[in-house]
A protein has these predicted regions:
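A surface/secretory-pathway sequence property marking extracellular, secreted
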Residues: 32, 41-44, 48-49, 90-132
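Solvent-exposed, conformationally flexible loop/turn segments
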Residues: 39-40, 66-72, 133, 198
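Short beta-strand elements of extracellular/lumenal beta-sandwich folds
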Residues: 57-90
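Short, acidic/polar linear motifs in exposed loop/turn regions
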Residues: 83-87, 98, 146-148
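Juxtamembrane/start-of-transmembrane alpha-helix segments at the extracytoplasmic/lumenal side
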Residues: 196-210
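C-terminal membrane-anchoring or membrane-association module
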Residues: 212-226
Length: 226
């Protein structure tokens, strides 16, 4: 062997390869259903949205003013946690920030806890070990606070608020429970509530619409990009 000179085959040199691994949990949230109840009759509209839509189209519900007092409107959301890294780990807690104008009803949300101040949380996935590439799902339902002045855009936000892996690795591109919208452990889902003048209006500009007649009242579930 010749010191300080690289010659293949000499025994005074060797190579060592290191594989870098990382921990990365990502969250996606989207509206799956718009639910309208009038006098005990429930009508469910599937939005057809998927977690890959970014940004997600707004789900619009247009209500007949004359029927307003007899209506209950709910929105069902799905939350997907995906392990995008190389290290298996857990989403120990998910926190959801309920927007003004919507409310959390415990009876609709088994496994969720009301933390107060329009914040709810769940540990439904705390014991679910997510292997690299694996996903797990939870759902949450929020109810519109009925009122002619409670209209407009309502944006619901969810975030991974606690994670864990047995390597002690931090998420490579997110910090749990820090409310930073640019990070991939947080996502939002928008809905829009409006009042009609009595006649149904269907807009064709962007997206598509589904028209539903409920006991004489007209409700427009419209999905479009702002």
């Amino acid at each position: 062997s010749i010191p300080d000179k690289w010659n293949d085959g000499e025994d005074d040199q060797d190579k060592e390869y290191i594989k870098l691994t990382y921990f990365d949990l990502a969250l996606r949230k989207w509206v799956t259903q718009a639910i309208v109840v009038e006098n005990g009759k429930e009508t469910v509209t599937q939005t057809g949205h998927t977690p890959e839509q970014d940004p997600e189209p707004v789900v619009k519900v247009e209500l007949n003013r004359k029927k307003l007092s007899s209506l209950t409107v709910k929105f069902k959301y799905s939350i997907r946690i995906t392990n995008q890294g190389d290290i298996a780990g857990y989403a120990k807690e998910i926190t959801d920030y309920v927007p003004e104008g919507l409310k959390f009803v415990a009876e609709d949300n088994k496994g969720w806890t009301d933390e107060g101040n329009n914040v709810i949380s769940t540990k439904l996935l705390e014991n679910k070990l997510l292997q690299p590439g694996e996903s797990a799902y939870v759902e949450v339902t929020l109810t519109w606070i009925n009122g002619k002045d409670n209209l407009g855009l309502k944006t619901n936000i969810a975030e991974i608020s606690e994670d864990y892996n047995d390597k002690g690795a931090h998420d490579i591109d997110s910090t749990p429970d820090n409310k930073v919208p640019e990070e991939d452990d947080q996502d939002d889902a928008p809905v829009l509530i409006s009042i009609s003048t009595g006649e149904a209006r269907i807009y064709y500009a962007l997206g598509f619409a589904v028209l539903i007649t409920i006991a004489g009242g007209i409700i427009l579930i419209k999905k479009f990009v702002l």
